[in-house]
Amino acid sequence: MGDGPSEMIMLMTGLIVAGLVSTVLLSTWDTMSQGLENQGDLEIKDAKTRASLVSDPSAISWDNTDDRATIFIQNSGTISLSIDDICVLLDGNTMSVTPIDAAGVTWSKGVAIKFQIESSTDLTFTDGTEVFLTVGVSSLSTSPTGTYSLTEVIRLDV
């Protein structure tokens, strides 16, 4: 007869523990589900963010005196890109990037923008030098922001 109350206490304890465990599991699942959803949104934005070099890669004019060149990059994706958020590497060197005649322009699908790329260090190339040009762009929209980078071998015309 004395076992009834202790069994009832054990049953209640088991139910409370089971309730706490299920709450933790549901909370964890919700967090994981939200993370997967955010990752999916990011992948969609990345897939819609694209850019292409439309300058002739076999004849990019390079100025050894001013350490600069002019390139044309086209938005070949389906969403608008940020003109001010572009990164360019030339032969592994970070370049400063300035859009030319792009004031008030929305860098939407199909639009090509002229950029001047300039090195802060002395880069001297000979005519016909082949180097890697890497361009990174990001979407104009945020939360999440789509990103894309392209790398091409270009020949410098000095």
Model-derived regions, located:
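C-terminal juxtamembrane segment of a hydrophobic transmembrane alpha-helix
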Residues: 8-38
